[in-house]
C-alpha cells in the first residue's frame, strides 16, 4: 500500500521515566498511514517503552500521543475501546497464554471485544487467522509449549490480526529466529502490509529487516528521536551511533545482502527470456 501523508500516530514532547531514571525526554514522532515504520536504538533507549506508551500500557510523565487522531494519554480503557479495536500487537516473545491452545489464544481479543459473537464464527475466524499467519491448519489445537520459536511468533501474529486491524505493532518479531525464519517473517510482514493495507510499527535490531521491508526508520538515542528517514537519509546524518550502527560490519553485510538480492531479481527476467528463446 502506498504511504499517504496522513499521520496514524503522533507523539509530541514525550517524557518517560522510572524513578530517577529518565528514558525519554522531549521525544517527537510521526508515523504515516500505510508505511512500515522501523524503530531502532541501543539497549536502554526505551523502544518497547515507547510502544507501550502509544498503546496505553505505560503512562508517560508528560507529552501528547494521538492514534487515528484520538488522544490516548489519561484515557479510560472503556473510552479507548473503539481505538484499540483498530490495532493489533505482537509482543516480544509472542506473549501467548500457555494454558490456551493456539486457536484459543487467537480468539482472546474476539471474545473480549465481541462477547456476543457466535462461537462458531469465532472458531472460523481463528482458524483463518492461524493459516493467514503462515501456520499449518493443524496448529490450532496445539499448545504454545508444542511450538517452535518461529511458530510461536506466528501464533502471536495470528492473535494480533484477529480483529482485522489497520495498525500493527511488532516488538522484535525476528528476535531468536534463524536467518531463514527471520527472512520468511519479513516477507510475510511485507505481504500483509500490501494486501491488508496495514500500517506497521516495527521495533527491531535486525539490520536485514530494516533494509528489506522498512519504508522509514526512527533512531532513538539521547532520550529522543535523533533521526527519521530512509537508510540513505539516516546515513547522511553525522550522529556517531547512527554511523556506527549502519556503517559497521553488520550494516555493510546487510547492505551487500540487499544489493545482491536486487541483482538476482533483475537477472531473473533475463534468464526467463533466454530460456524461452531456446525453446523449439
Model regions: which residues?
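Conserved catalytic motifs of ABC-family nucleotide-binding domains
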Residues: 164
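Conserved ABC ATPase "signature" region
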Residues: 71, 119-138
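The feature captures the beta-strand-to-loop junction immediately N-terminal to the Walker
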Residues: 40-42
Amino acid at each position: 500500500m502506498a504511504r499517504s501523508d496522513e499521520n496514524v500516530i503522533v507523539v509530541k514532547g514525550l517524557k518517560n521515566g522510572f524513578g530517577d531514571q529518565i528514558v525519554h525526554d522531549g521525544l517527537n514522532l510521526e508515523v504515516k498511514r500505510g508505511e512500515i515504520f522501523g524503530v531502532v536504538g541501543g539497549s536502554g533507549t526505551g523502544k518497547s517503552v515507547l510502544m507501550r506508551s502509544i498503546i496505553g500500557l505505560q503512562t508517560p510523565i508528560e507529552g501528547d500521543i494521538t492514534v487515528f487522531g484520538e488522544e490516548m494519554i489519561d484515557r479510560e480503557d472503556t473510552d479507548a475501546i473503539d481505538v484499540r479495536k483498530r490495532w493489533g500487537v505482537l509482543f516480544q516473545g509472542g506473549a501467548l497464554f500457555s494454558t490456551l491452545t493456539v486457536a484459543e489464544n487467537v480468539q482472546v481479543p474476539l471474545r473480549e471485544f465481541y462477547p456476543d459473537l457466535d462461537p462458531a464464527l469465532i472458531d472460523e475466524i481463528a482458524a483463518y487467522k492461524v493459516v493467514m499467519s503462515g501456520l499449518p491448519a493443524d496448529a490450532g489445537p496445539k499448545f504454545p509449549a508444542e511450538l517452535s520459536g518461529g511458530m510461536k511468533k506466528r501464533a502471536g501474529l495470528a492473535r494480533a490480526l484477529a480483529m482485522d486491524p489497520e495498525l500493527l505493532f511488532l516488538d522484535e518479531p525476528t528476535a531468536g529466529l534463524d536467518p531463514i525464519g527471520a527472512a520468511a517473517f519479513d516477507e510475510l510482514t511485507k505481504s500483509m502490509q500490501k494486501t491488508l493495507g496495514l500500517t506497521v510499527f516495527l521495533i527491531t535490531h535486525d539490520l536485514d529487516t530494516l533494509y528489506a521491508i522498512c519504508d522509514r526508520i526512527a533512531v532513538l538515542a539521547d532520550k529522543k528521536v535523533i533521526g527519521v528517514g530512509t537508510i540513505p537519509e539516516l546515513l547522511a546524518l553525522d550522529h556517531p551511533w547512527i554511523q556506527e550502527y549502519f556503517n559497521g560490519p553488520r550494516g555493510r553485510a546487510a547492505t551487500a545482502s540487499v544489493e545482491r538480492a536486487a541483482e538476482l531479481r533483475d537477472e531473473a527476467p533475463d534468464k526467463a527470456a533466454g530460456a524461452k528463446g531456446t525453446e523449439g
